[in-house]
A protein has these predicted regions:
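Intrinsically disordered, low-complexity regions enriched in proline, serine, glycine
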Residues: 33-34, 44-45, 53, 67-71, ...
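Hydrophobic pocket/interface hotspot
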Residues: 20, 31-32, 55, 108
Length: 134
């Protein structure tokens, strides 16, 4: 199979997205930590978390009881070093809050026959537009 075979990297990326958000929404988020490489980095709303332990603390320490992600779309592409870049767009609803738009980007790399996440960037789609002085 050719690395740039569209079906291959699309399937890997789509399977990752489906599994990640299913785990995040429906089960113990501690299971997500197994997807991250030892030295992985997560940036959550501008705050950096380095390493699996720090990422586990962030993912399991969220203040909500329930959450549901609705994936609007995603883009998946291979990189020159045979990794996979995944960009996800959607909405999330936590507890009784109104739905919010979100964007999340994952870098997936092959390691010992499995795919691991080395980089994860999450941002809510909230715009902080300054009000002009009158």
């Amino acid at each position: 199979m050719q690395w740039c075979d569209n079906d291959y990297f699309q399937k890997v990326g789509e399977d990752f997205v489906q599994w990640y958000y299913n785990q995040f929404d429906n089960t113990n988020r501690m299971e997500l930590v197994n997807l991250y490489a030892e030295g992985a980095t997560l940036t959550w709303e501008g705050t950096l978390f380095s390493g699996r332990e720090a990422i586990a603390g962030k993912l399991t320490g969220m203040p909500f009881q329930q959450i549901k992600h609705i994936i609007t779309d995603h883009d998946i592409q291979p990189t020159l070093d045979k990794s996979i870049l995944v960009m996800v767009f959607g909405q999330l609803k936590a507890d009784n809050d109104l739905p919010l738009a979100f964007h999340q980007v994952f870098m997936l790399k092959p390691l010992n026959g499995n795919w691991v996440c080395t980089n994860d960037v999450f941002r809510l789609g909230v715009h902080n537009i300054p009000v002009e002085a009158q």
